Amino acid sequence: MALNVVILAAGKGTRMRSDLPKVLHPIAHKSMVQHVIDTAHSIGSDAIQLVYGYGADKLKSALGEQQLNWMLQAEQLGTGHAVAQAIPNIDDNDTVLILYGDVPLIQASTLEALLAARPDHGVAILTVNLVNPTGYGRIVREQGKVVGIVEQKDANAEQLAINEINTGIMAVPGKALKTWLGRLSNNNAQGEYYLTDIIAMAHADGVEINTAQPQSAIEVEGANNRVQLAQLERAYQAREAEKLMIAGANLRDPSRIDIRGEVTVGMDVMVDVNVIFEGKVVIGNNVSIGAGAILIDCEIADNAEIKPYSIIEGAKLGVAASAGPFARLRPGAELMQDAHIGNFVEMKKAVLGVGSKAGHLAYLGDAQIGAGVNIGAGTITCNYDGANKHLTVIEDNVFVGSDTQLVAPVTIGKGATLGAGSTITRDVGEDELVITRVKQKHLTGWQRPVKIKK
């Protein structure tokens, strides 16, 4: 029995006041619908039917080449009509799970519980109890058993008093779903084909209907405007921050952190305020991350320190390495064990060896730097000739004086010393001292220019 997921994503989202289709608005730098797609994959879906309508080109461009079946809903005539567009790709023996592209916080564990609650040949619907259920369809029960769902505009006074509401998420047998969708009518206050009407049909056909509930109501909330989108963003961030704390991170203020990807942390990790994580970030034990740092697709080893306002992207920090404040590691950069870069040092496709240091104001690009090297302030590897990038090699225990330019390709041998202000254009041998600056001149009695009075 295959799990066939139908995701409804055809709406325009007029209240968003945007040209972007509603489901493409982001939560944690990922579109709402992509969150739903990822969750569907995580529970082992065999197929995903994406029902789309408004903004088709933008939707297809944003979602790219994914394992999706695109099912067009040319007219938005209700949720039942939307699901019906997926019928050509649904087999009789499928379990059909219906999800919504603007409900991004639904968790895999909740969907697994819903699927487990579905009886053989029966239906399972996800419900939640709200203090204020206004606007939602109500779950109608008789003697504890679900007999139907009534929408807000069609409900009588007794039904409006019901607090258990329909989330719209349900698991339905494929063959029965086809039959029930074929019976739908739009004879209601909205003039639409309600998916919810299939529940009364299931009851009338003697089909068993079970329910499940999420761990939190926020899982099933959608975003119809930017205020609700911001609320979902905060809820998502709170949930992700909680995961980090449970895993061993000490967050200085859990409400002032942004997690926009997959973060793995070790024990006793300290994270100060306003830190941003993006992509896949792996952090070891006893790591300290200062305020305002940005970590993107990087690996941080045990006991490393990232000082405030540093940007670490596509890079690695070794054991007890440190960066910052105001340092930038670009893709391909790596600090080996005990290596350090300080304020306003930038590295790209460069390795700084064990115990080596670049304390201030340097650019190290396309460079292999050995152990025990000191990089003076203002040092630049001149790696680009206007057409191609070239490699700088600095071997172990080299001392590079301040304001030195290394014009690549060039190799500096072990133990060499480069005098401050030098421009190095040729290879330097081991233990050599190289000074290329112009000889210092002393002009006695020099008279400074005097300003001319006007």
Swiss-Prot record:
Annotated positions binding acetyl-CoA: 377, 383-384, 402, 420, 437
Region (Linker): 227-247
UniProt-annotated catalytic positions: 360
Primary localisation category: cytoplasm
CDD domains: GT2_GlmU_N_bac, LbH_GlmU_C
Keywords, alphabetical: Acyltransferase, Cell shape, Cell wall biogenesis/degradation, Cytoplasm, Magnesium, Metal-binding, Multifunctional enzyme, Nucleotidyltransferase, Peptidoglycan synthesis, Repeat, Transferase
EC number(s) reported in the record: 2.7.7.23, 2.3.1.157
Binding positions (Mg(2+)): 102, 224
Cofactor binding remark: Binds 1 Mg(2+) ion per subunit.
Pathway(s) this gene product operates in, as recorded in its UniProt entry: Nucleotide-sugar biosynthesis; UDP-N-acetyl-alpha-D-glucosamine biosynthesis; N-acetyl-alpha-D-glucosamine 1-phosphate from alpha-D-glucosamine 6-phosphate (route II): step 2/2; Nucleotide-sugar biosynthesis; UDP-N-acetyl-alpha-D-glucosamine biosynthesis; UDP-N-acetyl-alpha-D-glucosamine from N-acetyl-alpha-D-glucosamine 1-phosphate: step 1/1; Bacterial outer membrane biogenesis; LPS lipid A biosynthesis
Subunit-structure text: Homotrimer.
Designated name of the protein: Bifunctional protein GlmU
Organism of derivation: Shewanella sp. (strain MR-4)
Species lineage: Bacteria, Pseudomonadati, Pseudomonadota, Gammaproteobacteria, Alteromonadales
Gene field: glmU
